[in-house]
């Protein structure tokens, strides 16, 4: 009798344990992300010829070069006030040249890639008694040079940047006299204060053109070549969970008079 009870309880408990505890498998898929270039140099193809008395051989090789560029910050304009007001056109010139050289080599050949950027900034100032207009023209040349076994390949990109800065009209000095009525003196004083205030503040028109006081402008533009490749990979992870129940841990009892 007791043996039957124990067998029944063991079967019920085994079914319950099998339904409650199962193997669990968790898998993670690898994730890869690669940044794409914003500018790529066209491939350079080289053909070598070798011939003997009966046969001519052609060997063609292609060299690929890719550059990554990041967006440069906006050009910083540093204003340095002049001691005296210019009365004629006062041009100034700023030139900045940056050169970046990268060397590629294999067992037989060495490739040298040179990236040169030149920025030419020209400023011209008109008479300060008028609304002087300062024009800055930047001619940018980006030359990529690849040298291979005595042959040189050059690719040049040219872009022109036009920067326009407007100067406000210089204030005219209005002198006040002690003679005359008080109303005219107050009116002249208000005009003087208003003119000085207009010459010192920055005005913005409806076309978002900025006005500022007469000064010498220095514009510096810099650029740097940056190569970035980002790869993130997660390895798959497999997890197994197994729980077993031992029959010796199952106990049972039956009351007298119970028949199973």
From Swiss-Prot:
Glycan-modified residues: 23, 249, 256
Taxonomic superkingdom: Eukaryota
Signal peptide positions on this chain: 1-19
Keywords: Glycoprotein, Signal
A single GO cellular-component term on record: fungal-type cell wall
Extra remark beyond the main annotation: Present with 688 molecules/cell in log phase SD medium.
Function description: Required for vanadate resistance.
Protein name according to UniProt: Protein SVS1
Higher taxonomy: Eukaryota, Fungi, Dikarya, Ascomycota, Saccharomycotina
